[in-house]
Structures are given as C-alpha cells and as structure tokens.
Amino acid sequence: MSSEELSLLASRLGGTVTAGPKTTVLSVPPDRVVEACVGVSSLPGWYHLTTITGMDIGQDIAILYHFWQGKRFLQVRTQVPKSAPRLASITGSLAAGTIYEAEIQDVLGVAFEGNPFLGKRVILPDAYPPDAPPPLRKGTDPHKIKKMMELE
C-alpha cells in the first residue's frame, strides 16, 4: 500500500496517518473502524489481520487492529470511552476478528456489537463476578476480585 493510498483512505474516513519505519498507524473515529479495517484488508498486500489488542489509556480504551505485510505492519487504531465501551464488530467482514474481539470484551469490557460471542465468556471463568470490573482495566484490584470469587 502506498502512502498516497493510505492518506486517501484516512481522508475519506476522517482519520490521520502516522508513519514509522516499520509500523504505520491509521487512527479513525470509532464509527469508522469497520470501514477502515475492510479498506485496509482489501488493498493489495494488506490481507492479513494478525491480532486485535486493547489498552486502558485513562478515560478511554484504545483498540488496535494489527495488519501485516511482509516486514511492515499497519495498525488501525480507535478509542472508545470507558463510560460507554461499545464498538461495531468487524466479524461481518473479517471473521478472523471474532475471537480477538471476544477476548477484549472479557478482559477490558468493550462490547463489540455484532460479534457472536457478545455477552459470553471466552477467557474468564464462569465464576468471575458479573459486577466485578474487567480485570485488565487500570485500578482493578485483583485481591478484591479474589474475595468476590471466594478464592481468598
């Protein structure tokens, strides 16, 4: 993918591009993330979604979709507020995202609308208290969760 093609995609989606020596980041608003991922995966060479990661960055949760091409990487990045952690699922267009989104839902509490695992546990045990905070959010006290699960 040329930098010109990526810049055109970013412009169309209301996003920005930050290019590094090996990794380029396409940052887009949350309501454009599906279109961005489909756009990236349909361009020549950017065919492989390797994973999706999430990070607690304070008031928001950042979601990064990692694509691979040879020795270069491209990330589609967006953010959702912790107060309303919902995002459209890419699984309707990129089925490879199904389990990655389900994992992020479990550990960071982001609901991916349209994901077949929405509301189901895939990593956390069934005994994990439904009223406990997601375990990878900043400020989550693992000792408190252990007590809630009656493990201490």
Language-model regions: role of each:
Residues 1-152:
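Terminal low-complexity/charged segments
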